Curated annotation (Swiss-Prot):
Family: Belongs to the RNA polymerase alpha chain family.
Function of the protein: DNA-dependent RNA polymerase catalyzes the transcription of DNA into RNA using the four ribonucleoside triphosphates as substrates.
Domain of life of the source: Bacteria
Alphabetized UniProt keyword annotations: DNA-directed RNA polymerase, Nucleotidyltransferase, Transcription, Transferase
Region feature (Alpha N-terminal domain (alpha-NTD)): 1-245
Organism field: Treponema pallidum (strain Nichols)
Taxon lineage: Bacteria, Pseudomonadati, Spirochaetota, Spirochaetia, Spirochaetales
Protein name: DNA-directed RNA polymerase subunit alpha
Stretches the record annotates as Alpha C-terminal domain (alpha-CTD): 261-351
Length: 351
């Protein structure tokens, strides 16, 4: 039986803040705070390892290269050590280039095979292997091979959806396919992850952790989606260690919110606050229904939201100040203090 107050006093982040500066489809920087001392490093290291090893993506798992002579007679390239006639690069180098290609298949596709035919003197790059509505190639400028006069080759690519790194010898299903050369598959779309821990202040304490996380991907998955997938993987692996009914646990987000007046304030509906029609509609469109939910949104996140201009942002901040609240709150102690002082003043006035 767990202690009902198991998480009492634990500071935990309420919002993952996306820093939009220099962000792109391939790069994102995020911050989360506050963490108890040491928890920022624990979470950051765990996320980094899972991001680099366990996010799913597409990769080439097998290649069949057929060379044709002047009479049109076909010959399968039997291994990575056999040279392709009238092609400048070694076959091993060409296979390594195919391994570096980054793909996207139509949503839901687990695997597919694509066939191409090339003739004459031409430099083949990633864009030459794209198939409209079937295969999107993101590394379009990657040089695959240079063909010379007299070259005539057919290339068959086997593209699959997978996780992590899978060596060529694991693709034993190609053993019965004549001419298919299995290759090492690098499925991970996450290229690099860096995290940093800084101190942050909550109330009178300045020893909490703030986690900054930078993620670089190949463009087949957005950085924020990769983080979400990594967090889900970690969460599912820890579930087996919980040997009690979590509904019996008193999951207090912030103990200082137990003050009835604070809870009442944070549960105030956005529709009941004197916002302008535009500001209210923007918040409701974002799915923000109460003042408590609004205080957990960072200023940067709100400013980057569509249809929230400077005027609306200023209005929202001003209205929160009237309630002794602000954007990006993690500590409600002062709200409780102000609430108690106001109640004491009302009691004195009534007396």
């Amino acid at each position: 039986m767990p202690r009902r107050n198991l998480l009492k006093g634990f500071k935990r982040p309420k919002v993952l803040e996306f820093l939009s500066e220099n962000s792109s489809e391939c790069y994102g920087k995020f911050t989360a705070s506050p963490f108890e001392t040491g928890f920022g490093t624990t979470v950051g290291n765990c996320l980094r390892r899972v991001l680099l090893s366990s996010i799913q993506g597409y990769a080439v798992t097998g290649v069949r290269i057929t060379s044709f002579d002047a009479d049109g007679v076909a010959h399968f390239i039997s291994s990575e050590f056999e040279q392709i006639p009238h092609v400048r690069e070694d076959t091993l180098e060409i296979l390594n280039n195919f391994k570096r290609l980054r793909f996207l298949l139509p949503q839901g596709a687990e695997s597919s095979t694509f066939t191409y035919e090339f003739r004459g003197a031409v430099s083949l790059t990633g864009k030459d292997f794209a198939k409209k509505f079937q295969l999107e190639v993101l590394s379009q400028d990657l040089l695959i091979m240079e063909m010379m006069d007299g070259a005539h080759v057919e290339v068959e690519l086997h593209v699959e959806f997978g996780r992590g790194y899978v060596p060529a010898e694991s693709h034993d299903r190609y053993a019965d396919l004549v001419g298919v050369i299995p290759v090492d598959a690098i499925f991970s779309p996450v290229l690099r992850v860096r995290y940093d821990i800084q101190s942050c202040r909550v109330g009178q304490r300045g020893d909490y952790d703030q986690l900054s996380l930078e993620v670089w991907t190949d463009g087949t998955v957005r950085p924020e989606d990769a983080i979400a997938e990594a967090a889900k993987i970690i969460k599912e692996h820890f579930t087996v260690f919980v040997n009690f009914d979590e509904t019996a646990l008193d999951l207090e987000d912030e103990p200082e919110e137990d003050d009835p007046a604070v809870l009442e304030l944070l549960n105030t509906k956005i529709a009941d606050v004197d916002f302008s029609v535009r500001a209210r509609n923007c918040l409701l469109t974002m799915g923000i229904k109460t003042l408590g939910e609004l205080t957990r949104i960072s200023e940067q996140t709100l400013a980057n939201t569509r249809n929230v201009g400077k005027k609306s942002l200023s209005e929202i901040q001003g209205k929160l100040q009237e309630y002794n609240l602000r954007l990006g709150m993690a500590d409600y102690n002062h709200v409780g203090v102000v609430s108690r002082l106001m109640r004491q003043k009302e009691e004195i006035d009534e007396a």
